[in-house]
């Protein structure tokens, strides 16, 4: 096995992931560092998703590097801003691969990750830890993609089970009008169909906007018990406020991609009763070993 393959295997072990060493991938960096490429939103309405993910990753890698890195090589993240726009993400991906990053890491979102998919697949560059649960990145299987999150199908199935167990069976869906939102809608619809139910209403919002009036006008008259939101924090917060102002008295459930802290910050006191599902351990439960490491 060549040195490049050995390096990738050491890197993946350092992250606690499956080995990346078997691929003939982008050129490894010099002996002193491993450079990961991240395209994510660092500006615009979804900026906090990219900013917070990057800060968390840097916190881990700073600790890893202080302990000697991976095979005595430090790990660095090279970031590029895509504003949560697929075309910009695709261009960033081409540039990062041209710059010979070791792997792509921490991409934010479904439409952006799907834009990068054919590019990194053709280049045979690993795609590690995307912040998305889209089924389109899981089926068909792609040996270059390494997931660390549950799928949206799994997440929405548990949301629907929770709601119906509480007797809340009239469920509406507010979703982003792109691959992410449609993946979440499909998950909710499938979970309801398994119970011989269907959404009482659905409505959309465009990506990177907060124009929710049409969605409120469509969903509130359907009188749902709950609204499952498949959007980013800005649009979700706008919908919560507008729906309540229009007289909706039900509950709101969000998938984890919404950005829990960002949504809480956006809503402030209006966040009471808004639920966000989680697919990773809570950082606020010190009984867990991984949480103690984080703290």
What positions do the PLM features span?
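Immediate post-signal peptide segment of exported/extracytoplasmic ligand-binding proteins
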Residues: 25-38, 69-74, 164-167
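Short beta-strand segments enriched in small/hydrophobic residues
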Residues: 33-50, 107, 171-174
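Loop/turn elements at helix/coil->beta-strand transitions in domains of secreted/extracellular proteins
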Residues: 73-75, 99-103, 123-126, 141-143, ...
């Amino acid at each position: 096995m060549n040195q490049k393959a050995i390096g990738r295997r050491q890197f993946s072990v350092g992250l606690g992931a499956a080995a990346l060493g078997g691929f003939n991938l982008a050129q490894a960096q010099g002996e002193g560092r491993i450079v990961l490429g991240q395209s994510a939103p660092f500006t615009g309405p979804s900026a906090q998703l990219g900013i917070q993910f990057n800060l968390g990753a840097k916190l881990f890698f700073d600790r890893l590097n202080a302990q000697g890195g991976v095979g005595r090589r430090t790990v660095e993240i090279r970031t590029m801003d895509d504003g949560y726009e697929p075309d910009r993400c695709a261009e960033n991906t081409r540039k990062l691969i041209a710059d010979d990053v070791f792997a792509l890491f921490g991409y934010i979102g479904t439409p952006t990750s799907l834009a990068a998919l054919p590019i990194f697949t053709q280049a045979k560059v690993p795609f590690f830890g995307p912040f998305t649960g889209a089924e389109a990145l899981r089926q068909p299987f792609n040996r270059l993609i390494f997931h660390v999150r549950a799928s949206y199908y799994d997440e929405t199935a548990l949301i629907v089970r929770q709601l119906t167990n509480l007797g809340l069976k009239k469920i509406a869906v507010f979703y982003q009008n792109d691959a992410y939102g449609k993946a979440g809608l499909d998950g909710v619809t499938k979970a309801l169909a398994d119970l011989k139910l269907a959404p009482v209403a659905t409505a959309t919002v465009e990506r990177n906007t907060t124009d929710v009036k049409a969605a409120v006008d469509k969903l509130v008259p359907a009188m749902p018990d709950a609204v499952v939101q498949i959007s980013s924090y800005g649009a979700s917060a706008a919908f919560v406020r507008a729906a309540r102002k229009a007289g909706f008295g039900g509950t709101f459930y969000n998938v984890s991609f919404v950005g829990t802290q960002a949504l809480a910050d956006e809503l402030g006191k209006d966040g009471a009763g808004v639920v966000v599902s989680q697919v990773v351990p809570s950082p606020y439960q010190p009984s867990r070993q991984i949480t103690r490491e984080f703290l």
